[in-house]
C-alpha cells in the first residue's frame, strides 16, 4: 500500500458535525474480535449532546449539498467506489476482525457495498419531476422530486458495511444528509469506516456524522429528534416495532424504512435437481454462520425426496470446515458474541426436547458453534417458528406441493424465500403463492442486487431498498402550481 493510502487511523474517534472527536458520554465501548476476543478498539461513547450536534450540523450542511448538481454528487459516489477498490484489503480485514466474518463472506460484503455505491452514482440523474394536466384555466401543475432532508440510519452487526451503505450511498446521492448509529458490536464497519471513505471521496463536512452511543442513552433520542425526516433501520422485528411507534406516534412524525427479521423457507419440490438443491441449501444456510436476515431458516422438502435429501444434506454439512474466519478455507466462523452463542445453545436444547432428530451437531469452541442440522421438524417447534440467527437449521416434511406452500407461508415473517424445481412454470406459480418480498427459483434466498427491490412483507418490515425504489424512499413529491392568468374565485 502506498504512503498516500496508509491505513485509516484514529478509529476510536467519531465524525460528529464535521470533526473527528471523542464522544462526551464519559464511558467507553470495548470493540472485540468475536473469534480471538482481542480488544480491537476502545471508543469513548457519544451522548445526546453529541447526537444533537450531529443532527443540527447535518440539517445545515444538507441545503448546500442538495444544491450541488447531479454530476457533482455522482462524482463523490464514483470517488468512493475508487476508494473501495484501493482499500479493498483494509476493508475486508476490518470486516473479518470486527464482525467475525469468514474471508468468503467479507469479500462478498465488500463487493455488495461497492456495488450499491456504484449504483448510487446513477441516481442523481434518474430523479424526474412531472407536469400534470389541470382543469383550472391558466394553471401549470408541476411535481418536483426533492430530498427528504436528513436521514437517520441505524445499522446492524451482521452485514454492517453493506447494510449501512445500502441506505447511506443512495440517500447521499439524492441530496440528503445522514447521521449513522452503528451497532455496538461493529462501530467501525457499520459507520466509522464509511465515514472515512466518504470524507476521502470529497463529501462536504457536516453532511455525514457517525454517532457511536449506547441504545439506552441515545437510542430513542436518535428516532425522536426533530431533525431527521426519515429513519432507516435494519435489525430485529421487536426493535423495529418500537422505532415505528416512535416515528408514527411521537411529537415529530417521520418516514421509516424497516428491514426486520426473517424466517426464510427453502422449498425442495419432488422434481428438483437434488445435487443443486443440496449445494444451495448448504450455502444459503451457513454463509456467515447463518447470521443473515435472508438466510435459510426452514428447509421444506416434498415427501418423495425427503429422506434422500436429508441424508445427502447432512453428509455435506458434516464436511464444512469451521473455526478461524481469517483462513480462506473456513466456511463457519464465530457468532458475534457470547450472548448470541448462549441463545443458540438454548435453541438447540429446545429443538432436542421438542423431538427434532439430530443429524449434525458439535460442541462450541469459544464463539464458534459448529453446524447443527435437525430433521423431522414440525411447524409448531421453536426452530421452525422463530428466526434462527446462527448455524442451526431444521428440515420439515411436506406431503405434497400444496402442503409445502402452506408450510412456507406459516410464518409471521415474509422477507426472502426460495423454491427448487425442474419446471420453471411450476416454480413461478409456487413463487407467486409465497407471501414474501422476495422469492428465488433454483437459487438461495440470500440475494441482494443494487438495482432490484429489497424488502419484506408481514413482520419482516416496511419499504424497499435499491435502484428506483431507493429514489422513492429517500425523496418526496412536492406539488407546485403556477397560475399564469388571474383565476376567477367563487367569492
Swiss-Prot record:
Pfam family name, one: Aldedh
What does the UniProt keyword field contain? NAD, NADP, Oxidoreductase, Plasmid
One GO biological process term is: p-cresol catabolic process
Transmembrane stretches, by residue range?
A: none
Under catalytic activity, the entry for this protein gives:
4-hydroxybenzaldehyde + NADP(+) + H2O = 4-hydroxybenzoate + NADPH + 2 H(+)
UniProt-annotated catalytic positions: 259, 293
Task: List the signal peptide residues.
Answer: none
Report the gene knockout effect. Answer: Cells lacking this gene are still able to produce 4-hydroxy-3-methylbenzoic acid and 4-hydroxybenzoic acid.
Annotated Gene Ontology MF terms?
Answer: oxidoreductase activity, acting on the aldehyde or oxo group of donors, NAD or NADP as acceptor
- This entry's Enzyme Commission designation comes to 1.2.1.96
Tell me its family: Belongs to the aldehyde dehydrogenase family.
Summarize the protein's role.
Involved in p-cresol and 2,4-xylenol catabolism. Catalyzes the oxidation of 4-hydroxybenzaldehyde and 4-hydroxy-3-methylbenzaldehyde to yield 4-hydroxybenzoic acid and 4-hydroxy-3-methylbenzoic acid, respectively.
Name of protein? 4-hydroxybenzaldehyde dehydrogenase (NADP(+))
Amino acid at each position: 500500500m502506498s504512503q498516500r493510502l496508509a491505513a485509516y487511523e484514529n478509529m476510536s474517534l467519531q465524525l460528529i458535525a464535521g470533526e473527528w472527536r471523542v464522544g462526551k458520554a464519559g464511558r467507553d465501548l470495548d470493540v472485540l474480535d468475536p473469534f480471538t476476543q482481542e480488544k480491537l478498539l476502545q471508543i469513548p461513547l457519544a451522548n445526546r449532546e453529541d447526537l444533537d450536534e450531529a443532527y443540527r450540523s447535518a440539517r445545515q450542511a444538507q441545503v448546500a449539498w442538495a444544491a450541488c448538481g447531479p454530476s457533482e454528487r455522482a462524482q463523490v459516489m464514483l470517488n468512493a467506489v475508487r476508494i473501495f477498490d484501493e482499500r479493498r484489503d483494509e476493508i475486508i480485514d476490518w470486516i473479518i476482525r470486527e464482525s467475525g466474518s469468514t474471508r468468503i463472506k467479507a469479500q462478498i460484503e465488500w463487493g455488495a457495498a461497492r456495488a450499491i455505491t456504484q449504483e448510487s452514482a446513477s441516481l442523481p440523474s434518474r430523479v424526474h419531476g412531472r407536469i400534470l394536466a389541470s382543469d383550472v384555466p391558466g394553471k401549470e401543475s408541476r411535481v418536483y422530486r426533492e430530498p427528504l432532508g436528513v436521514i437517520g440510519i441505524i445499522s446492524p452487526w451482521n452485514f454492517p458495511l453493506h447494510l449501512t451503505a445500502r441506505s447511506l450511498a443512495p440517500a447521499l446521492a439524492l441530496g440528503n444528509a445522514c447521521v449513522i448509529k452503528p451497532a455496538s458490536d461493529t462501530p467501525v464497519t457499520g459507520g466509522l469506516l464509511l465515514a472515512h471513505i466518504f470524507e476521502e471521496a470529497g463529501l462536504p463536512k457536516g453532511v455525514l456524522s457517525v454517532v457511536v452511543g449506547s441504545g439506552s442513552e441515545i437510542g430513542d433520542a436518535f428516532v425522536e429528534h426533530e431533525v431527521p425526516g426519515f429513519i432507516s433501520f435494519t435489525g430485529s422485528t421487536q426493535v423495529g416495532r418500537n422505532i415505528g411507534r416512535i416515528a408514527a406516534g411521537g411529537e415529530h412524525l417521520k418516514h421509516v424504512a424497516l428491514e426486520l427479521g426473517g424466517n426464510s423457507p427453502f422449498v425442495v419440490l419432488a422434481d428438483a435437481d437434488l445435487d443443486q438443491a443440496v449445494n444451495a441449501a448448504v450455502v444459503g444456510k451457513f454463509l456467515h454462520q447463518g447470521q443473515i436476515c435472508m438466510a435459510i431458516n426452514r428447509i421444506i422438502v416434498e415427501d418423495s425426496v425427503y429422506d434422500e435429501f436429508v441424508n445427502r444434506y447432512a453428509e455435506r454439512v458434516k464436511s464444512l470446515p469451521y473455526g478461524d474466519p481469517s483462513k480462506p478455507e473456513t466456511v463457519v466462523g464465530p457468532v458475534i458474541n457470547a450472548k448470541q452463542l448462549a441463545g443458540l445453545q438454548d435453541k438447540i436444547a429446545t429443538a432436542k426436547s421438542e423431538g427434532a432428530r439430530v443429524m449434525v451437531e458439535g460442541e462450541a469452541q469459544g464463539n464458534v458453534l459448529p453446524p447443527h442440522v435437525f430433521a423431522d421438524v414440525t411447524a409448531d417447534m421453536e426452530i421452525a417458528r422463530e428466526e434462527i440467527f446462527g448455524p442451526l437449521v431444521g428440515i420439515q416434511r411436506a406431503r405434497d406441493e400444496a402442503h409445502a406452500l402452506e408450510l412456507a407461508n406459516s410464518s409471521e415473517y415474509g422477507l426472502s424465500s426460495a423454491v427448487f424445481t425442474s419446471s420453471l412454470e411450476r416454480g413461478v406459480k409456487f413463487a407467486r403463492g409465497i407471501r414474501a418480498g422476495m422469492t428465488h427459483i433454483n437459487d438461495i434466498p440470500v440475494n441482494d442486487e443494487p438495482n432490484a427491490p429489497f424488502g419484506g412483507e408481514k413482520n419482516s418490515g416496511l419499504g424497499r431498498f435499491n435502484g428506483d425504489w431507493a429514489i422513492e424512499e429517500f425523496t418526496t413529491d412536492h406539488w407546485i402550481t403556477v397560475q399564469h392568468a388571474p383565476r376567477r374565485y367563487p367569492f
